[in-house]
Amino acid sequence: MTLTLAVYGKGGIGKSTTSCNISTALAKRGKKVLQIGCDPKHDSTFTLTGFLIPTIIDTLQEKDFHYEDIWPEDVIYKGYAGVDCVEAGGPPAGAGCGGYVVGETVKLLKELNAFDEYDVILFDVLGDVVCGGFAAPLNYADYCLIVTDNGFDALFAAKRIAASVREKARTHSLRLAGLIGNRTSKRDLIDKYIEAVPMPVLEILPLIEDIRVSRVKGKTLFEMAESDPSLNYVCDYYLNIADQILSQPEGVVPKDAQDRDLFSLLSDFYLNPTQPASQTKELDLMMV
């Protein structure tokens, strides 16, 4: 049975880099993986393939939208570690609906029976946009994963994504697998957030520059580690995420949280920071 994942998060948070490394980790665990990029920039799979692959929407336009004239090899490209890659693409900037293209991508892949060929399908979805079109992958997903950092904006975006998961979970067995903290030196705000909106934290990746560099190089951390074994410890973070997903965790249906309440909670963290206990003790001694 195919396990389907949908990766969301604030724009620029590192979803595509995270997705590519999770896909690779799943492949390293012996799974046949398909990663579907759902972003008009069509750069989701760049880290796996090393180049911008042709998009499904471009291929459909070339064939005048005759689905019967398209073969799997026309739209599916082989990436690192044997991960198969698809890019949905999108309309020209400022014209059309990118969410519609996501729907057409799913329709074509179903026509090609591609969904039945894989152990794991991973949707890497544009930013924190959760309109009907870009929320479509949630209709097929078993689990949603939210990429964040220890910052206000990313966690507030996570709240909106969690609300979409809750809505979609009304009609099928979608669950939120948890948060992935990407390139963050702290997790105190993440911990404050999950106190208000309980959900698992799958992994917290430290502030490692090689994660950012891997994106520029068009390589996964696993591929970089082949020539630089010192990076193997970074790969272990992604393998840990893969192992948790493959264990098919229970996950959660996120509880409801009002925007204003969560906004106040997160902003209060910055406006009224609590002093470390050691510092408070020092101040008390000074006052005596």
From Swiss-Prot:
It holds the Pfam family Fer4_NifH. InterPro entries: NifH/chlL_CS, NifH/frxC, P-loop_NTPase, Protochlorophyllide_ATP-bd. GO terms for biological process: light-independent chlorophyll biosynthetic process; photosynthesis, dark reaction. It catalyses: chlorophyllide a + oxidized 2[4Fe-4S]-[ferredoxin] + 2 ADP + 2 phosphate = protochlorophyllide a + reduced 2[4Fe-4S]-[ferredoxin] + 2 ATP + 2 H2O. Binds 1 [4Fe-4S] cluster per dimer. CDD domains: Bchl-like. Homodimer. Protochlorophyllide reductase is composed of three subunits; ChlL, ChlN and ChlB. Belongs to the NifH/BchL/ChlL family. This is Light-independent protochlorophyllide reductase iron-sulfur ATP-binding protein. The lineage of its organism: Bacteria, Bacillati, Cyanobacteriota, Cyanophyceae, Synechococcales. The gene is chlL.
